[in-house]
Amino acid sequence: MPRVKTGTNRRRRHKKVLKLAKGYRGTKGNLFRIANQQVMKSLTYAYRDRKQRKREFRRLWISRINAACRQNGISYNKFINGLKKAGVEINRKMLADMAVNDEQAFGELVDLAKKSV
């Protein structure tokens, strides 16, 4: 049986990696070995940062809610505790949006939380 070289498979694999490395600076976008290393690292970063994005957005929402609460004379933890006691089930994303865009409705929620604490 004749020896089979990995011609077409290798070319296909190299093209796939170089396509993923498109736009990288210098040899990281041109040479297969270096591009392959960079693509592997980039995919690792992408996986990690998809998890981190969720944490960062939650932190941002909490910061916005806290700032709006303090303008209305209540701390964040008392506000959240008051909402839970009042039976209000609005997630932090919606609360942050209300705090930025609909201050009147947010103020009503703050009053409700103050009464139930």
Swiss-Prot record:
InterPro entries: Ribosomal_bL20, RIBOSOMAL_L20_CS, Ribosomal_protein_bL20_C
Gene Ontology process terms (BP): ribosomal large subunit assembly; translation
Pfam families xref list: Ribosomal_L20
Any one Gene Ontology cellular component term annotated for this protein: ribosome
Keywords, comma-separated and alphabetical: Ribonucleoprotein, Ribosomal protein, RNA-binding, rRNA-binding
PROSITE patterns: RIBOSOMAL_L20 (PS00937)
A GO MF term: rRNA binding
Primary role: Binds directly to 23S ribosomal RNA and is necessary for the in vitro assembly process of the 50S ribosomal subunit. It is not involved in the protein synthesizing functions of that subunit.
UniProt family annotation: Belongs to the bacterial ribosomal protein bL20 family.
Descriptive protein name: Large ribosomal subunit protein bL20
